[in-house]
Regions:
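Conserved active-site tyrosine of GNAT-family acetyltransferases
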Residues: 16-21, 90, 114, 139
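Vicinal oxygen chelate
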Residues: 2-11, 29-32, 42-47, 51-54, 62-136, ...
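N-terminal beta-strand motif that seeds the catalytic metal site of vicinal oxygen chelate
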Residues: 1-17, 73-76, 123-136
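Flexible, glycine-rich phosphate/dinucleotide-binding loops
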Residues: 35-37, 50, 64-65, 123-126
Length: 139
């Protein structure tokens, strides 16, 4: 058995592609418009992955629908070569870092559809670095 893809439902293709491609750095590798089913599937891959497995499938239903109660997903996880650089790039592009990488290992952000993305440092944690360092409060 091998991992193929993770599917998340999105409400706005443009906002989602801006987030996942322009801000996070994924690339679109395939798109399927299904007129009979009234939906579009967009498959995205990480920069250095093959284009058949480990994909993110964005599902856009043409008829408007709000996704509540976990109907759109939990979280996605990606490993990166430098968590600080990735978080800085995201922040500079207007993305809120919900859980900063203070430990040099893990961070969380959210997509425009509220999907949580876990960003993990590849290999060992990086040493603490500004502006992400933990501040000690002296009383």
């Amino acid at each position: 058995m091998k991992y193929l893809h993770t599917m998340v439902r999105v409400e706005n293709i443009e906002k989602s592609l801006d987030f996942y491609c322009n801000k996070l750095g994924l690339k679109e590798v395939r798109r399927v418009d299904n007129e009979k089913g009234r939906f579009t599937l967009i498959f995205l891959a990480a920069e250095n992955s093959d284009e058949k497995t480990g994909l993110l499938e964005l599902t856009y239903n043409w008829d408007p629908e709000k996704y509540t109660g976990g109907r759109n997903f939990g979280h996605l996880a990606y490993s990166v070569k430098n968590i600080y650089e990735v978080c800085e790039k995201l922040m500079n592009n207007g993305v809120t870092i919900n859980r900063p990488p203070r430990d040099g290992h893990m961070a969380f952000v959210r997509s425009p559809d509220g999907i949580s993305l876990e960003i993990l440092q590849e290999g060992k944690s990086l040493p603490e670095q500004e502006p992400w360092k933990l501040s000690l409060i002296h009383i």
